[in-house]
Each structure stands twice: as structure tokens, then as C-alpha cells.
């Protein structure tokens, strides 16, 4: 009998090969560097709102424990650490964690980076759980969601960012981004693994969390930047609160 786990070994090996590119804004992860400011702003605003914090204060997140699941090279962990949060970043790809640790030291920050999976640290609890651009890469979505929710404290919030399962997302996120524009390596995403907002809401709601918001994120080619939108056909973020 095989023990359940959320790891897709092919996905891990794929990102292992790319990990050294994480902190190169003009490298293979350039699209993520371009996408990062809008998701970072969204997270900071809504974390502050949920915990009634003023982002203009010095170290406004100093009493918060935050975990970023599938943290990669630490693109979200570092800015949250700078805001005073106690940040844990976990990733199943060891190379990602090594890259994140190196950059953390170069940045003079203190972040708890672990090469592990959410189901392996269920004894730890956090105020904020981040599942950003990770759910479309896991093997067992239901088990992954359950494992992530197990890490959340009462009163805490969990965020998901992923890609909707629509014809538009196939055209833009795969054909456009991978084959035409070459923003991402071919094979980065599989349309069959994309998931709709309603699917996430239904899966999370089984655990009696309250759905707070779903927001789309679209790319504006005129300004060469991402912006928030009511259009959730391709990229979107959603978050939930545990009472």
C-alpha cells in the first residue's frame, strides 16, 4: 500500500532544472517577476485587512506566522519577511530551497526554508497560508488542499493563485505563453491540471472555511504589466478565512 502524498515527481524534476533562474528578472522566470508585484500587493493588502494592520507601520506583520507552500526561490517570502512576518517557505524541490537560502543570506533576512511537503508539517500552525501558482502542479488536489488547510490557525486566511480551466486559458496560458510568446518553457503547464474558481471554492468549503473573494489578474500589453480584474477566465486569486 502506497502512502498518499501531494508530490508529482515529474513536476519537481522540471523545476529543479530551472531553479537557478529564479532570481534573474530577465531569465526563464521573467514572467513571474513581472507577475509578482500585483500578487504581492494583493496579498499584503488583504492580509493587513484581515488582521486589522496598518501597512505603513514599521514591521506591520511582526506578529504573523506566514507559510508559502511551493515557495520556489523565495520571491514572495522575502518581501513578507521585510514586513516583519515570521516566514516559512517550503518546496518539494531541494534546489529551489538551496537557491532561496542563498538569496536570503545575500538579502540579510531570516526565513525558515524547508525542503518538505505540507502534509509533513501538520503539527505547525500559521496565520496565513499561501498556495500561489502551485495547485496546478500537484498530483492530488483534494489531499493537497486538505494538507494546506491543516496548517491554518482559527482566524487565519489561506490564499490560492492559479489558472482557470477554460478554452481562453488554453489559448493564452499554454498556446500563447509557451508556444508563441515563449514566456515559459513548453510543458510548464498542462491544461488538464487547471482548476476553476468554483472547484476550489467547493473543495475548500467542505472544511467550513468562508470564501472572502475571487479576483482575476490580466496582462495589459500596452503597459507591459499585470493588473487586477473581474475577468477570472485565465489567471485568478481567491482567499478564504477559517473561523
For each feature predicted by the language model, list its residue ranges.
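N-terminal, positively charged/glycine-rich alpha-helical extensions of SAM-dependent methyltransferases
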Residues: 1-29, 33
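Conserved hydrophobic residues forming the short capping helix/wall of the S-adenosyl-L-methionine
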Residues: 47, 51, 104, 204
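Core SAM-dependent methyltransferase catalytic element
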Residues: 225-243
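Conserved SAM-binding loop
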Residues: 53-169, 197-200, 238-242
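Acceptor-substrate binding/catalytic loop of class I
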Residues: 162, 182-199
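Short alpha-helix
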Residues: 191-208, 214
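Conserved alpha-helix/loop element of class I SAM-dependent methyltransferases that forms part
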Residues: 34-62
Amino acid at each position: 500500500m502506497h502512502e498518499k502524498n501531494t508530490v508529482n515527481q515529474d513536476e519537481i524534476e522540471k523545476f529543479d532544472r530551472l531553479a537557478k533562474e529564479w532570481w534573474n528578472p530577465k531569465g526563464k522566470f521573467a514572467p513571474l517577476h513581472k507577475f509578482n508585484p500585483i500578487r504581492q500587493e494583493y496579498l499584503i493588502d488583504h492580509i493587513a485587512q484581515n488582521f486589522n494592520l496598518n501597512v505603513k507601520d514599521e514591521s506591520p506583520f511582526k506578529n504573523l506566522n506566514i507559510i508559502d507552500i511551493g515557495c520556489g526561490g523565495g520571491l514572495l517570502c522575502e518581501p513578507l519577511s521585510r514586513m516583519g512576518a515570521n516566514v516559512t517557505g517550503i518546496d518539494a524541490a531541494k534546489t529551489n530551497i538551496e537557491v532561496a537560502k542563498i538569496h536570503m543570506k545575500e538579502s540579510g533576512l531570516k526565513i525558515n526554508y524547508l525542503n518538505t511537503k505540507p502534509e509533513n508539517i501538520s503539527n505547525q500552525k500559521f496565520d496565513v497560508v499561501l498556495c500561489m501558482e502551485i495547485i496546478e502542479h500537484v498530483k492530488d488536489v483534494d489531499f493537497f488542499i486538505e494538507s494546506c488547510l491543516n496548517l491554518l490557525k482559527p482566524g487565519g486566511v489561506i490564499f490560492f493563485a492559479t489558472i482557470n480551466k477554460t478554452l481562453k486559458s488554453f489559448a493564452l496560458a499554454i498556446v500563447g505563453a509557451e508556444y508563441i510568446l515563449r514566456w515559459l518553457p513548453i510543458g510548464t503547464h498542462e491544461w488538464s491540471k487547471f482548476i476553476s474558481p468554483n472547484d476550489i471554492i467547493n473543495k475548500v468549503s467542505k472544511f467550513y472555511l468562508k470564501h472572502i473573494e475571487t479576483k482575476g489578474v490580466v496582462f495589459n500589453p500596452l503597459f507591459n504589466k499585470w493588473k487586477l480584474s473581474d475577468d477570472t477566465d485565465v489567471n485568478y486569486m481567491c482567499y478564504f478565512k477559517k473561523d
